[in-house]
Amino acid sequence: KSSESVYQQTAVVKGTDTVSYLIKSLTQNTTYYYRVAAYCEVSGTQIEGKLSTAVSAKTAAVSATSKGAKKYSTKAAFTKSPAYKTYKKMRSAMNYNKSFAIPGMKTTNVAGFSCTTMVPQGLCLAGSYFLITAYDYKNEQNSVIYVVSRSSKSYITTIVLPSKAKVGGIAYDGTNVWISKGKAVASFPYSVVTNAVNAGTSYTELAAYKSVSTLDSTASFMGYYNNVLWIGTFRQATSTMKGYQINNKATLPSLSPAYTMDVPSKTQGITFDSAGTMILTRSYRTKKAKSGYISQLRTYKPSFASPKSNGKVLKNTAMKVTTMPPMVKGAAVYGTYTYALFSSSYYKSCKYPVDRVIAMKESKLVE
């Protein structure tokens, strides 16, 4: 604390303008003291200036990532919620016991920093786990993946991603997990997930992606089916998503464009079942009275077996359209159920928030 105290050098930070340095692995609820000094190099020798006056900083206690539902803590509370009572089609297809709370909505431990502003985005099934992506609305903390047990539907751990991207899309190809990264998609091996689970820690930091493939437009959503990674961009009008063949899964994955498919405006998520049924979510805005509002889940049977000569796959007419509560986002299929994720629990303006991943019998979404 005093000028006579012994200080340990933490870092040498280079830069000619304002610079910053993030110090990790500090003890919670502990006061640390810091002094800085300017330096320069003369003929290869580092010359340091006088140390500054000591400045103190106390680390805060970081709460564990929340496991429970943000708004409705029990089944009784949820079944009395405006969304459950109002959206009859969702209610009739829903299996409450297979549904589960979206973790991290109250607070998320992001590598030792507490974040209460995570917004859920994408959902996929990867082996024994559901993976949920989320980004920090305030853009202060890195984006994350919540790992949830497929069998127990309970939150296990968090994977902290190496960027603050919006991570709207996530998919699993049987070997690698793919994730949105602006005008690119990045991949990392499934072993990252299993290692994070086996580590038994509250979070694991992913230092870098295994591969990054650049695109010509923003990757807002994605889904995997039959060795093709389908990637699309959220748009206010009908748009075209692209299907990419995945190369070198076991080594350094890369993508080759192969197909296209038209999708409706305001598409937020896609997923596929083993028979090739495509489940597509559309949503925009939190209030019905707002211009352009929509929130629905659609099912299609695309003509995958007979693409046109230019690679276009017809999605065909929707088999069924199910009106959903506001802000439906990612979707995943496990067994005979479709799981839908919502971001509405973050927005105070939403009168029909859903703080759970809702499991719905797929047969009721296609008939």
Model-identified regions with their sequence ranges:
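Extracellular fibronectin type III
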Residues: 28, 40-63
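Sequence/structural signature of beta-propeller modules
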Residues: 61-111, 358-367
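Beta-strand-rich domains and repeat architectures in extracellular enzymes and scaffolds
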Residues: 103-141
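Repeated scaffold domains used in trafficking and secretory/extracellular systems
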Residues: 115-122, 164-171, 211-224, 263-272, ...
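Loop/turn-rich, solvent-exposed surfaces of beta-rich toroidal or solenoidal domains
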Residues: 261-309, 327-329
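Conserved blade-ending motifs and adjacent loop-strand segments that build the rim/top face
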Residues: 307-334
